[in-house]
Amino acid sequence: MSAVLPPVLTVQVDSADSSLAWASLGERRWRCVVGAGGVREDKVEGDGATPAGTYPLRHLYFRNDRLVLPKVRLPARAIGEHDGWCDDPRSPAYNRLVRIPNEWSHEKMWREDGLYDLLVVVGYNDDPPEGEWGSAIFLHIARDDMSPTHGCVAFARDDLLEIVTLIGPETKLNVHSVSAAEQRPRPRSDEDDDMKQFEDFDEQDW
């Protein structure tokens, strides 16, 4: 009898330096965005890229003052006002949830823009965290204009609410590009160019 493969949430971008992507799980499909630095196998802290590869999904965090969490199978915890995520490679708590304020560089989990109202922690560079290979890689809510992230994978709010009901501890995240050999820097500073790229992507025959 052949082994049953665990489900995989696949994120595929058009090219290694693109930020526009499609995610799929079984027959379901969602539009999403990745980092402004594209998808890279050689990701480092602060490069704005999403790491290529296959990773576990650890657990999820949510704002219980902003949404009602549906039934999920991943471990879940409500975000507090003093929760942060350490992005300082010098810290012993690098790429970990921390209490803030503290002396190390970190990002706030309690955000006013709604991007972290719901997020899933991706098991990237966390077992254990090493060097400066990057931190705080999440699945989270996208901005309304679906602009690139700083390295996470972002979805429309309703889509992410659906996704978290379908994934579990056995689910893996696979991120790759159609042209995985392309590894060019892709600075994105012109918002109009970003939106034009998104429109062109949406018109492709999928």
Task: Please report, for each region that a protein language model flagged, where it lies by residue.
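Conserved "landmark" site that anchors the functional core of diverse proteins
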Residues: 156
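Short cysteine clusters
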Residues: 152
